Amino acid sequence: MRTLWIVAMCLIGVEGNLFQFARMIDAKQEAFSFFKYISYGCYCGWGGQGTPKDASDRCCFVHDCCYARVKGCNPKLVEYSYSYRTGKIVCETYNRCKRAVCECDRVAAICLGQNVNTYNKGYMFLSSYYCRQKSEQC
């Protein structure tokens, strides 16, 4: 399984906080749930366009919007500190940029966990053909 994890990270392009975000998702669902979202719908994974396909995809859309609002740093490369307290993800970073990125990831992980029942395997590796509609505004 460790080899699969390493291969997946190489395929999608490892970024600074990707591992942290993956661990947050796994904390709100079952282990290795992150893999379900590597390429899901129109927004989960690299980039995004069109209309989110379901509530899970909308979580990724909102996450992308959150990253777009983080100014003065690169949210995909920022590493931050967080912990789990009584089942909750707690961002512990005081740096403005790092805290904002941590909060984006925390909210998205919670959202994906709350909407896991909307997950549709048919949206995994969805062709961009189905995401051609005009993108919503953040």
Swiss-Prot record:
Coiled coil: none annotated. Ca(2+) binds at residues 43, 45, 47, 64. Keywords: Disulfide bond, Hydrolase, Lipid degradation, Lipid metabolism, Metal-binding, Secreted, Signal, Toxin. It comes from the Eukaryota. Its main location: secreted. Exhibits high hydrolytic activities and shows strong preference for the anionic micelles (dPPC with deoxycholate) to the zwitterionic micelles (dPPC with Triton X-100). PLA2 catalyzes the calcium-dependent hydrolysis of the 2-acyl groups in 3-sn-phosphoglycerides. One of its GO terms (biological process) is negative regulation of T cell proliferation. InterPro entries: PLipase_A2, PLipase_A2_Asp_AS, PLipase_A2_dom, PLipase_A2_dom_sf, PLipase_A2_His_AS. The active site is at residues 63, 105. It is found in: Secreted. GO terms for molecular function: calcium ion binding; calcium-dependent phospholipase A2 activity; phospholipid binding; toxin activity. It catalyses: a 1,2-diacyl-sn-glycero-3-phosphocholine + H2O = a 1-acyl-sn-glycero-3-phosphocholine + a fatty acid + H(+). Disulfide bonds join 42-131, 44-60, 59-111, 65-138, 66-104, 73-97, 91-102. Residues 1-16 form the signal peptide. It comes from Daboia russelii (Russel's viper). This is Basic phospholipase A2 Drk-b1. Its EC number is 3.1.1.4. Its cofactor is Ca(2+). Binds 1 Ca(2+) ion. Belongs to the phospholipase A2 family. Group II subfamily. D49 sub-subfamily. SUPFAM superfamilies: Phospholipase A2, PLA2.
